[in-house]
Amino acid sequence: MEENKQRVKSMINILQLVAPGTPLREGIDNVLRAQTGGLIVLGYNEQIKSIVDGGFHINCAFSPASLYELAKMDGALILNETGSKILIANAQLVPESSIDSIETGMRHRTAERVAKQTGSLVVAISQRRNVITLYQGNLRYTLKDIGVILTKANQAIQTLEKYKAVWNDGITNLGILEFEEVVTMSEVVHVLHSVEMVLRIKNEILSYIHELGTEGRLIRLQLTELLADLEAEAALLIKDYYQEKTQDHHQILKKLQELANTQLLEDSDLVKLLGYPGQTSLEESVTPRGYRITSKISRVPPLIIENLINRFKTLQGVCRATINELDDVEGIGEVRAKKIREGLKRIQEHLYMSRHN
């Protein structure tokens, strides 16, 4: 899993470097349109130095126009690691010929071998096929046309909207069952599955956004709007149902996101994520602590909610508490006690209305 996380992080960094709207991508696109082909290496460490033969040391500031003009020469361009300077033009690269390569063309084969030998980012721009291929270590990624990525991103947004609706239905139903005191592990796991799918699609959309660069601003806005408060509420759901009382609910949600990236989760995986044995029956009754529901009461800060739960232990305990009992809790006066009672009643009514709409 750690290796996969590192791989994803590397890919994000690479895509951000060559995303539309960046000077480097502008220069690459110019070379692509001119159909001259090109080979660009980012980074000039000792390993790169050992495989560079010849070339002109120019050490000038990067500009898209400079890249375009210098790429007309047959050799490779060597840039610094951030792509802000062009160090060498028309360099011949001589990587180890014993390094395996799946590529057939000389330019792409050289690019793959240089990337594997040095770990540097290498960009190969095809002369005839209008394709940009990125290599770094064993990573190989072909940049897609912006129109194709936008179409996929919009499809993913539509899918996310559907799973958001599933989440809304599940969390509404769970809220009603919480007030009725009939929640089982099955309902909690069902809602967590919808969180899993939302997080999985979110990660896919983020990868499109990284690749779209400045073209992905609208997609990012849609994603932010769709996920508003969902992750915060999911973290409180975990805090409600984790077997032992925990303050690490955000870390547990992060772990769920990492697991969602690598595999489809079984019910037992989600049960274990909540701190229970994997063989726990889904029909087992569970009781919420009440963090999620009480957080919906207006003007009740988290510290007061923490005091409430510490005193009454569960949502049912808070709901059954009298005005005087609520008044006894630190930070709650008579006025706030009444607001809490009224707030809980309004939330319950809203949940019933939502289910029947």
UniProtKB/Swiss-Prot annotation:
Domain of life: Bacteria
GO annotation (BP), single: DNA repair
Cofactors (names): Mg(2+)
UniProt entry keywords in alphabetical sequence: ATP-binding, DNA damage, DNA repair, DNA-binding, Magnesium, Nucleotide-binding, Nucleotidyltransferase, Transferase
Domain DAC: 8-146
Residues bound to ATP: G75, L93, M106, R107, H108, R109, T110
Catalysed reaction equations from the record: 2 ATP = 3',3'-c-di-AMP + 2 diphosphate
Molecular function terms from GO: adenylate cyclase activity; ATP binding; diadenylate cyclase activity; DNA binding
Enzyme kind, highest EC tier: transferase
Key word DNA damage present: yes
EC number: 2.7.7.85
Recorded family membership: Belongs to the DisA family.
Record's function text: Participates in a DNA-damage check-point that is active prior to asymmetric division when DNA is damaged. DisA forms globular foci that rapidly scan along the chromosomes during sporulation, searching for lesions. When a lesion is present, DisA pauses at the lesion site. This triggers a cellular response that culminates in a temporary block in sporulation initiation.
Known partners and oligomeric status: Homooctamer. Interacts with RadA.
UniProt name for this protein: DNA integrity scanning protein DisA
Gene: disA
